[in-house]
Amino acid sequence: MRKSLVIVLLMGACLGNAQAQLHLKANIQNNHLWRGMEVSDGVVLLTDLSYTMAHDHVTVGLWGGTNSEGSYKEFNHYLNLKAGGWSLALWDTYNFSPGANYNNHQYWNYSAHSTGRFLDATLAYHFDEKKFPLTLSWSTVIFGRDRSSDNEHQKYSTFVYAEYPIYK
């Protein structure tokens, strides 16, 4: 008990001077794309509730989406750490889609062989936004329903991209 109290007090002292912001965002779209794949068509409502702290270096959030037919539902938790142009994001993604070939009935199941979720890690570098607004990103599914056909091994599917705005 005493150690827990000391840890909580130290964390409070470290974060006591840090600025924090609460963000709530909602989008209505005509479909939902993820890494170039259509996840849902039709009218889609996407929401994001996040809390940013430590002078914009740490963000934790909840992200959700659903479509107008109710055939697509998604709920994610995420953590994003930023420092010196670098960012590391960890996303815990869970879809509640009917007809899925994965377990979408046990939300808290984190068993590697039977979970319906996946954990995604993204490492990105953001160059100077005013001089050279390029972002390079590497994302890998590190756990969950990205398994080999015999369900024995994680496949570690990876998505790499470069992003450069041509019009602002």
Explain the meaning of each model-derived region.
Residues 1-23:
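Cleavable N-terminal export/targeting peptides
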Residues 19-30, 81:
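Transmembrane beta-strand segments of Gram-negative outer membrane beta-barrel proteins
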Residues 20, 41-45, 71-75, 115-119, ...:
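Residues that define the transmembrane beta-barrel architecture of outer-membrane proteins
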Residues 22-26, 58-60, 77, 86-90, ...:
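Transmembrane beta-strands of outer-membrane beta-barrel proteins
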Residues 28-34, 53-55, 64-68, 83-85, ...:
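Transmembrane beta-strands of outer-membrane beta-barrel pores
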Residues 36-41, 72-76, 99-108, 146-153:
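Outer-membrane beta-barrel translocator domains and adjoining extracellular loop/strand segments
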Residues 40-92:
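Glycine- and aromatic-enriched membrane insertion/assembly motifs of diderm outer-membrane
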Residues 109-168:
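Detector for outer-membrane/organellar transmembrane beta-barrel domains
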